[in-house]
Amino acid sequence: MRVLFCVLLAVASCGRNDAEGDSTGSSSRSTDDTAREQARFDAERRPEKVVEALGIRPGSRVADVGAGSGLLTVHLARAVRPNGRVVATDIDGAVLDLLQSRLAAAGLADLVERRVVAAEQPGLEAASYDAILLAEVDHYFSDEVAWLKEATRALKPGGRIVISNRIHHRQKSMAAAQRAGLKLQSESTPVPTHFIAVFTVASPAAGGGK
């Protein structure tokens, strides 16, 4: 577990991609640096497509798992305002401090709860979320199937889990989601390097009659 935790901690500190990794090197970066980093990420990753896949709107409650320094979190917060909520989880409290700084600069801090969680636990309360986002994080779980099964308990009826990751992780992510009892609703590749897959919880009756 210590080896796994160290790997996950490194991932959390690096963020969701190389661009986000730069953000964790110093908490004293200028506002201009943060803005340039965000603009580069937005151009490369098209985060509006992730928001669209989540199906969130004003008033929604969404979990951003492994949120890192918040390059995607800011977009989720904008989508759910003025009366929604984003719960941003990570195993590293220091990187969530960077997230807080990014949100404060954007005037979105009041919409986001930062939550430090254990490496192998979702840390989300039951039946409380319209959507759960896993962006470039699911392949690091030692038991992805068990994690996803636990996470489904946090969804409201009709809620969805969205997995976004690099293309070379697609097969593993899809297989784990299927084994966890999730039903694929849609899939897209808004940029050549990443896929977005939308899942809902399969009905218990889907496999047979009464």
Model-derived features: where do they sit?
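Conserved SAM-binding strand-loop segment of SAM-dependent methyltransferases
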Residues: G107-E120
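A short acidic, Gly/Pro-enriched loop at the edge of an enzyme's catalytic core
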Residues: E120-I132
